[in-house]
Regions:
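Conserved CoA-thioester-binding segment of acyl-CoA-metabolizing enzymes
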Residues: 1-56, 88
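Phosphate-coordinating loops and pocket residues in cytosolic domains that bind phosphorylated ligands
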Residues: 26-29, 62, 71, 133, ...
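C-terminal alpha-helix plus adjacent terminal tail
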Residues: 1-11, 45, 60, 162-168, ...
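Glycine- (often His-adjacent) and acidic-residue-rich active-site loop
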Residues: 40, 47, 54-92, 105, ...
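Terminal peptide-recognition signature
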Residues: 16, 20, 35, 53, ...
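Crotonase-fold acyl-CoA enzyme core
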Residues: 6, 91-204, 235, 240-243
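Hydrophobic alpha-helical membrane-association signature
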Residues: 31-34, 82, 185, 225
């Protein structure tokens, strides 16, 4: 497991906290494995009625760890099975998910919220998915879920053009439920999760399932995306794009993206 994923039970709520602040919560393979286990364990436990995802101040997640990307792009290792092992349970969980975003939500740090039932964000939240900029394709079922949520054009701007969405734009697009101050974020997330947990659990799970696409449809799209993602990751185009990104990123004063 990973020391960068903190799991806590608060009553009937399971809190999954990304805790790698020195890397802006860039997600490693071990972190994916820890989150996958938490989701599966929580779903199997009748005492858990809701999941919560939180990051650290200033970063929900800056996306996948770029060192893992580089290793895969140069053929040193495979990349993808750990992500799939997390994304499929994320799509198939029967229990509601509430999330809180403060600061960066990049790549999978954005697409994870398409699987959440309520997402709270602070005014400084920034959602961005630079997949195509890195020679890659959308993941986490976002190519299916985003157009359904916000329409083709906004989804295209987010997923294909890599445009950043502020908290306000994300709320307008339907990614964010409510914008709250930084100091109130975790309390509001927990309040919502506890409200969910207080409802009759079977009725809640059925109601949630009725409002969502069948899990097998989402899982099928995630698998299709992953196939293209893996193929793209070892392409010359992606290798050059990732190396160019790392070159820019390592320059003094260079922004994250």
């Amino acid at each position: 497991m990973s020391e960068h994923i903190l799991i806590e039970r608060k009553g009937a709520v399971q809190v999954i906290r990304l805790n790698r602040p020195e890397k802006k919560n860039a997600i490693t393979r071990a972190m994916y494995a820890a989150m996958a286990k938490a989701l599966k364990d929580g779903d199997a436990d009748d005492a858990v009625r809701a999941h919560v995802f939180l990051g650290v101040p200033g970063a929900f997640s800056s996306g996948n760890d770029m060192q893992d990307f580089m290793a895969a792009a140069t053929g040193d290792t495979s990349f993808g099975s750990e992500i799939l092992d997390f994304l499929i349970p994320l799509a198939e969980t029967k229990k509601p998910i509430v999330s809180g975003v403060d600061g960066l939500a990049i790549g999978v740090g954005t697409t994870i919220h398409f699987h959440c039932d309520l997402t709270f964000a602070t005014p400084r939240a920034l959602f961005r998915t630079p997949f195509v900029d890195l020679g890659l394709v959308p993941e986490a079922g976002s190519s299916l879920l985003a157009p359904l949520l916000m329409g083709h054009q906004k989804a295209f701007a987010l997923l294909a053009l890599g445009h950043g969405f502020t908290a306000e734009a994300a709320q307008e697009a339907g990614i964010v439920y409510q914008i709250v101050d930084e100091e109130a974020l975790e309390a509001e997330v927990m309040k919502a999760a506890e409200e969910i947990a207080a409802k009759p659990p079977q009725a809640m799970q059925i109601a949630r399932a009725l409002m969502r696409l069948p899990a097998e449809n989402i899982a099928d799209r995630i698998t299709r995306e992953a196939k293209h993602f893996a193929e793209r990751l070892t392409s010359d185009e992606a290798r050059e794009a990732v190396m160019a990104f790392l070159s820019r990123k390592n320059k003094p004063g260079c922004p994250l993206l």
